[in-house]
């Protein structure tokens, strides 16, 4: 395809068509203080590639990188060790096929790995079936809500207070364009989940109850109790898993009554990636497969009787009129799904359980040590690799001070819930296998120094 640059007349016609006078009008939403004025500081107007690289490296050293500091951030995105073999294998030629595997004859590598990925997710979630992935955990959560509405023919979804606020926000944004009614709220700083409070919101209009497992505070809700109550009122239970490594140790949601299980697959194979791309996981009961969004890869045989893989049941999604489709999502996070599948394969079932046990033991060590810091209260007794501590002052300021001292010490609830003053002192701490006992000790001693007002 030829590249034909625009002429001044072309630009003028395009601006007139959208009602803009000049190019700068397209950037009015960017705050004035964020726009570049004049030359880039430290660089001349013309600079060589080497000079620009040197300048960028110098700027990057001002950042506190995840690999260079004790790292206890979580709340939906987790730092795990990803074996080098994952990045090596995803670059193999078998997977470097065209974007969409519509021609199975030339995309067997991609299709087979997606088939295996679906199998891994279904086994992990305890569901009958899983799709070939969605964009990320939050959009998968919304897709589960509207899927439940189609199945039950109801439009009220109860979002448990422990559901990640970003997932709630995504659902609220999408619900502006549908008839779905969402009930949600902020969590309380209680040690245990209040399942009875969730159940009290279920009525005959409820399509589904959405429960994070473990929740945003690290607590582990009683899914079976909520599932039984939801089913009694003709509603479905949607379980949301933001940390899939937890399922190496705790019971799969599908085994506890969840009808639809969704989640974020970033923890396995993908990495933090500055917040994306990530990987939406989606599983459900087989009887709901026709209402499930996204792609499905199936196993078949070719004309010679050899095993092969194809996209199947496509008529429920992209090969159909828009108003009849199950979703507006007609793609999947294929590369991230491949990385997830390779990492899972390298671990195996026993490896995943071992990894989960290491995470849990490190979290227990951290909770014990942080609980010894004067003024700190560990909120929850039951958790996987993430728990909440309550500080004597605003956690946002404490986190800022910790970062200045070289420790990335958790996610403040005040950042996640800026309008909830009662949560301001809460700090969510995630502890994975990358957190060494030395890191935990550094975190505890630094936190103690910050709270006692000691100079850095």
Predicted regions and their residues:
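Compact, charge-rich alpha-helical regulatory domains located at protein termini
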Residues: 1-34, 39
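Conserved C-terminal alpha-helix-loop-beta "cap" of PLP-dependent enzymes
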Residues: 350-445
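Short loop-beta-helix segment that forms the pyridoxal 5′-phosphate
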Residues: 102-106, 123-142
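Conserved internal helical-beta-strand scaffold that buttresses enzyme catalytic cores
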Residues: 97, 109-111, 115-118, 122-129, ...
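N-terminal entrance/gating region of PLP-dependent enzymes' catalytic architecture
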Residues: 36-116
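Active-site C-terminal subdomain of aminotransferase-like
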Residues: 268-380
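Gly-rich Lys/Arg/Thr-decorated short loops/hinges at beta-loop-alpha junctions or inter-strand turns
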Residues: 92-104, 122-127, 152-153, 175-183, ...
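Conserved PLP-enzyme active-site core in the AAT-like
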Residues: 2, 139-308, 389, 396-405, ...
């Amino acid at each position: 395809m030829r590249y034909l640059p625009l002429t001044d007349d072309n630009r003028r016609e395009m601006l007139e068509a959208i009602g803009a006078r000049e190019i700068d009008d397209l950037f009015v939403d960017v705050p004035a203080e964020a726009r570049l004025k004049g030359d880039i500081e430290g660089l001349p107007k013309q600079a060589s590639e080497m000079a620009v690289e040197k300048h960028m490296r110098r700027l990057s050293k001002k950042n506190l990188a995840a690999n260079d500091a004790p790292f206890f951030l979580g709340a939906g995105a987790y730092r795990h060790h990803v074996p080098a073999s994952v990045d090596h294998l995803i670059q193999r030629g078998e997977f470097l096929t065209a974007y969409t595997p519509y021609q199975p004859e030339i995309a067997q590598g991609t299709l087979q790995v997606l088939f295996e990925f679906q199998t891994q997710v279904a086994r992990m979630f305890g569901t009958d079936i899983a799709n070939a992935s969605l964009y990320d955990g939050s959009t998968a959560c919304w897709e589960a809500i509207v899927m439940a509405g189609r199945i039950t023919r109801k439009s009220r979804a109860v979002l448990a207070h422990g559901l990640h606020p970003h997932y709630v926000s995504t659902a609220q944004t999408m619900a502006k364009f549908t008839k779905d009614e969402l009930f949600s709220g902020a969590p309380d700083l209680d040690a245990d989940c209040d399942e009875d409070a969730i159940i009290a919101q279920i009525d005959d209009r409820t399509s589904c109850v959405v429960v994070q497992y473990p929740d945003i505070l690290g607590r582990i809700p009683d899914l079976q109790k909520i599932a039984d109550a939801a089913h009694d009122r003709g509603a479905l239970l949607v379980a949301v898993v933001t940390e899939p490594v937890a399922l190496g140790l705790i019971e799969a949601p599908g085994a506890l009554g969840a009808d639809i299980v969704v989640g974020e697959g970033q923890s396995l194979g993908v990495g933090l990636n500055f917040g994306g791309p990530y990987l939406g996981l989606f599983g459900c009961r087989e009887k709901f497969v026709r209402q499930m969004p996204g792609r499905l890869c199936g196993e078949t045989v070719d004309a010679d009787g050899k095993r092969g893989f194809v996209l199947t049941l496509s008529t429920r999604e992209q090969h159909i009129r828009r108003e009849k489709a199950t979703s507006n999502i007609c793609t999947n996070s294929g590369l991230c799904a491949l990385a997830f599948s390779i990492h899972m394969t390298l671990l195996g079932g026993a490896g995943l359980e071992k990894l989960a046990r290491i995470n849990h033991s490190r979290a227990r060590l951290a909770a014990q040590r942080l609980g010894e810091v004067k003024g700190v209260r560990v909120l929850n007794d039951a958790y996987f690799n993430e728990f909440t501590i309550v500080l004597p002052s605003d956690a946002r300021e404490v986190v800022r001070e910790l970062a200045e001292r070289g420790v990335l010490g958790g996610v403040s609830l005040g950042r996640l819930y800026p309008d909830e003053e009662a949560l301001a002192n809460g700090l969510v701490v995630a502890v994975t296998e990358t957190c060494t006992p030395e890191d935990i000790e550094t975190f505890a001693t630094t936190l103690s120094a910050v709270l006692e007002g000691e100079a850095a």
